[in-house]
């Protein structure tokens, strides 16, 4: 039996370092190191810890004593990924942010103003036309390439697939996997993309791909994830949001035929952090070429204080599936939760490193650790883990495919190798306190402007449906009371009437539970997943 090394947990369970015990160091082997970029996270941590109170230091000491291995494993930040940048002549298009930023227009008052908001001068977008016949992923028009942040030396890889239906009118969707530190190309080839990778390395057509009625962009972010790379690092969600705005702005500038169509951000897991912040960043720019219409968060981590309370019920048979843990383990989790909740509350109050890191370490060990040690799949309570570190053998098939030289050449990948998940990134985010920060507080502002869908497969443990339903009902916003009172109704496939889940909706807020779906709903329930997406994008649940 294999113990699951959850992407959402592996870094968190070993990601912090007590300042009084360890000295954070750089890795010994660096390629093209820009030391100032790598020193920023350490400097920020040092500055945050200067204000460490006696009470906070006692908390650090307490959690470090309880879980010493978790604190000892993060003395190093990750090493930059080896890469070779291609000459500009090898790309079909290059969009320079400085050129976009230099365009001025006259407003209604006769005053000159920039056509598009934002700080874009440091960004470029490189674009490659992908020949569909070379790889056989899909027959539709495809583009891949990099968003380059020349100031911070960051390079984010993307892969765009046009809609199979009506690309001139169909919406555009951005897909983000979580981790933090897992490649969105996993989502492409394992969940919602045009094809999946089989054990023999061959591709299998996906009839339920989300590009059935929408064009989809898969983005490897943050840097040093998948085909993306940097000599520096990103270790918090807010910093990553600036990159997303630049990517979309330059992409839609190069391809204006997509810019007027409805645009939606979707993702799963730690994307429950990313998506509210990324959407808020886009909406903060009033002069933009991004027609953001909604967001979709699948089995996300968004409000830790509410969600962590529901690990014990899900593990102990109260989530609709048989119990995974015995009574003594369930009782131990009950006993541990009050301390966990207290630590998260402290994090919510200060949003500082010194309060948020101990909360993550304690709560992940106390509330997720007992389940993880059983060897059961943290992404699906019905199954044991497979041989892969992340429980699914399909991840190995995908990695092998994306490491083929002909594949990397076809899409213009510049890194020496592809990894599905980078656990160092996971630890970096936690070490900066990002893990437990209250990003759900951004959601009420989003609901003022756009619809928000939170969906969850009902067999997931790591970001389970109980916790996701609970945080949406606890969220304070102007439609809170009406949403909380809204009843769950059957969600059925149009045509045959097959029940595939339940849904509740009020105002701009919708929650959906997908039956027999794990952490990755499109993987477990592809038909129900596409039904959900098609009907959501059509505006069926919006008010």
From Swiss-Prot:
Its EC number is 3.4.16.5. Keywords: Carboxypeptidase, Disulfide bond, Glycoprotein, Hydrolase, Protease, Signal, Vacuole, Zymogen. Residues 1-17 form the signal peptide. It is found in: Vacuole. Glycans are attached at residues 213, 508. The keyword Glycoprotein applies. Its main location: other. InterPro entries: AB_hydrolase_fold, Peptidase_S10, Propeptide_carboxypepY, Ser_caboxypep_ser_AS. The active site is at 269, 460, 519. One of its GO terms (biological process) is proteolysis. It catalyses: Release of a C-terminal amino acid with broad specificity. One of its GO terms (molecular function) is serine-type carboxypeptidase activity. Residues 18-128 form a propeptide. This is Carboxypeptidase Y homolog A. It comes from Phaeosphaeria nodorum (strain SN15 / ATCC MYA-4574 / FGSC 10173). The gene is CPYA.
């Amino acid at each position: 039996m294999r113990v699951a090394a959850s992407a959402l947990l592996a870094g968190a369970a070993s990601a912090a370092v007590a300042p009084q015990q360890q000295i954070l160091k750089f890795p010994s082997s660096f390629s093209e190191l820009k030391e100032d970029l790598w020193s920023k996270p350490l400097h920020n941590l040092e500055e945050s810890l200067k204000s460490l109170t006696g009470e906070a230091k006692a908390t650090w000491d307490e959690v470090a004593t309880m879980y010493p291995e978790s604190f000892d494993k993060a003395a190093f930040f990750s090493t930059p990924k080896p890469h070779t940048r291609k000459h500009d002549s090898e790309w079909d298009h290059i969009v320079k942010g400085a050129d976009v930023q230099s365009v001025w227009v006259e407003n209604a008052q006769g005053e000159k103003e920039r056509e598009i908001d934002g700080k874009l001068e440091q960004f470029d977008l490189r674009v490659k036309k992908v020949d569909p016949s070379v790889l056989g992923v899909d027959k539709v028009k495809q583009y891949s390439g990099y968003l380059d942040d020349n100031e911070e030396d960051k390079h984010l890889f993307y892969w765009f697939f046009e809609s199979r239906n009506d690309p001139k009118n169909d919406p555009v969707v951005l897909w983000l996997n979580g981790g933090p530190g897992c490649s969105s190309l996993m989502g492409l080839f394992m969940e919602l993309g045009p094809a999946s990778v089989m054990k023999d390395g061959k591709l299998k057509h996906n009839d339920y791909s989300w590009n059935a009625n929408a064009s989809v962009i898969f983005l490897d972010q943050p840097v040093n994830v998948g085909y993306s790379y940097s000599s520096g690092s990103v270790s918090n969600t807010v910093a990553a949001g600036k990159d997303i705005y630049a990517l979309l702005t330059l992409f839609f500038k190069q391809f204006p035929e997509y810019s007027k169509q409805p645009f939606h951000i979707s993702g799963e897991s730690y994307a429950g952090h990313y998506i509210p912040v990324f959407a808020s960043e886009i909406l903060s720019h009033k002069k933009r070429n991004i027609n953001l219409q909604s967001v979709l968060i699948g089995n996300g981590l968004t409000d830790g204080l509410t969600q962590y309370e529901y690990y014990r019920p899900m593990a102990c048979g109260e989530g609709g599936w048989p119990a995974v843990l015995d009574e003594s383990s369930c009782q131990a989790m009950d006993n541990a939760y009050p301390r966990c909740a207290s630590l998260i509350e402290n994090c919510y109050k200060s949003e500082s490193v010194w309060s948020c890191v101990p909360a993550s370490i304690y709560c992940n060990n106390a509330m997720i650790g007992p389940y993880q040690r059983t060897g059961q799949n943290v992404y699906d309570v019905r199954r044991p883990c497979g041989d892969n570190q992340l429980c699914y053998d399909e991840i190995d098939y995908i990695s092998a495919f994306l490491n083929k030289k002909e594949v990397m050449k076809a899409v213009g990948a510049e890194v020496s190798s592809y990894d599905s998940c980078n656990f160092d990134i996971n630890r970096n985010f936690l070490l900066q306190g990002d893990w437990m920060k209250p990003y759900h507080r951004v959601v009420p502002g989003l609901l003022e402007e756009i619809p928000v869908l939170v969906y969850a497969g009902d067999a997931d443990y790591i970001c389970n449906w109980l916790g996701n339903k609970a945080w949406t009902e606890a969220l304070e916003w102007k439609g809170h009371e009406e949403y909380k009172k809204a009843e769950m109704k059957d969600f059925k496939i149009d045509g045959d009437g097959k029940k595939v889940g339940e849904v509740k909706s009020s105002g701009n807020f919708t929650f959906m539970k997908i039956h027999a779906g794990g952490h990755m709903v499109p993987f477990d329930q592809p038909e129900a997943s596409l039904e959900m997406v098609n009907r959501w994008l059509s505006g069926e649940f919006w008010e």
